[in-house]
Amino acid sequence: MLGAMFRADTLMPANLNPQGDGHYFIDRDGKAFRHILNFLRLGRLDLPRGYGETALLKAEADFYQIRPLLDALRELEASRGTPASTAALLHADVDVSPRQVHFSARRGPHHYELSSVQVDTFRANLFCTDPECLAAMRNRFGVAIGDRAEGGPHFRLEWASRPQELPEVEYQRLGLQPLWTGGPEDRREVANTPTFLEEVLRVALEHGFRLDSVFPDPEDLLNSRSLRFVRH
């Protein structure tokens, strides 16, 4: 069919060509048609790396009845095998437990004073079916306390920022640890839920996820307790 269109002795019937110039107008997909012409010129299939429109090109080859191109496309699909699915689920839960910590504060050489301060302990559980995204989460946060096992879909964190009033020695005695995010040059402490969820959101979007649900208040994203992301 394609050859007939280009032969000089093949004219379009006058009743199908109101302008009377006797030429065909090929109204097909331009991007796919470029690869068809390349195949006819080179005699081989030469597609760019990662070309993802083989189904469209196959339909065009079938329309033009180019059997060798159809065979080449079938061989290409067979060599690629079944494409890996990109669908994935990411779920982030975070909970805070405030507690009152009592300690003795030194006010002088022989003067101690009983004091207390509230310490917020955060616990987060990240569940992700995409290992690359989960690894990026680990890299973004590091691990304060929790599961260091590789390969599972869960990543758990537990941390607590040290209030200014709480002495460092008391903070360490309680076995508490902070959580940091970012690289060496832009490292910052994750001191609250909004900061944690903001980082989760950044990593999720970088890996192609979209926000699916927010709990408990969909209107208050960064102060939520649970975020669910999906990728199709």
Swiss-Prot record:
Domain BTB: 1-49
Pathway: Protein modification; protein ubiquitination
Known tissue expression: Weakly expressed in lung. In the cerebellum, higher expression in non proliferating external granule cells layer than in highly proliferating ones.
A Pfam family of this chain: BTB_2
GO biological process per UniProt: negative regulation of neuroblast proliferation; negative regulation of smoothened signaling pathway; nervous system development; neuroblast differentiation; neuroblast proliferation; neuron differentiation; positive regulation of neuron differentiation; protein homooligomerization
Keyword Zinc appears in the UniProt entry: no
Coiled-coil regions, chain positions: none
InterPro entries with a match to the protein in the record: KCTD11/21_C, SKP1/BTB/POZ_sf, T1-type_BTB
Keywords: Cell cycle, Developmental protein, Growth regulation, Transferase, Tumor suppressor, Ubl conjugation pathway
GO molecular function, one term: transferase activity
Assigned GO CC terms: cytoplasm
Gene3D superfamilies: Potassium Channel Kv1.1, Chain A
Top-level lineage group: Eukaryota
Other noteworthy facts: Overexpression of Kctd11 by lentiviral vector injection inhibits xenograft tumor growth in athymic nude mice.
Function comment: Plays a role as a marker and a regulator of neuronal differentiation; Up-regulated by a variety of neurogenic signals, such as retinoic acid, epidermal growth factor/EGF and NGFB/nerve growth factor. Induces apoptosis, growth arrest and the expression of cyclin-dependent kinase inhibitor CDKN1B. Plays a role as a tumor repressor and inhibits cell growth and tumorigenicity of medulloblastoma (MDB). Acts as a probable substrate-specific adapter for a BCR (BTB-CUL3-RBX1) E3 ubiquitin-protein ligase complex towards HDAC1.
Oligomeric and partner information: Homopentamer. Interacts with KCTD6 and KCTD21; KCTD11 and KCTD6 or KCTD21 may associate in pentameric assemblies. Component of the BCR(KCTD11) E3 ubiquitin ligase complex, at least composed of CUL3 and KCTD11 and RBX1. Interacts (via BTB domain) with CUL3; initially a 4:4 stoichiometry has been reported, however, electron microscopy revealed pentameric states of the BTB domain.
Domain remarks in the Swiss-Prot or TrEMBL record: The BTB domain is required for growth-suppressing properties.
Entry protein name: BTB/POZ domain-containing protein KCTD11
Protein encoded by which gene: Kctd11
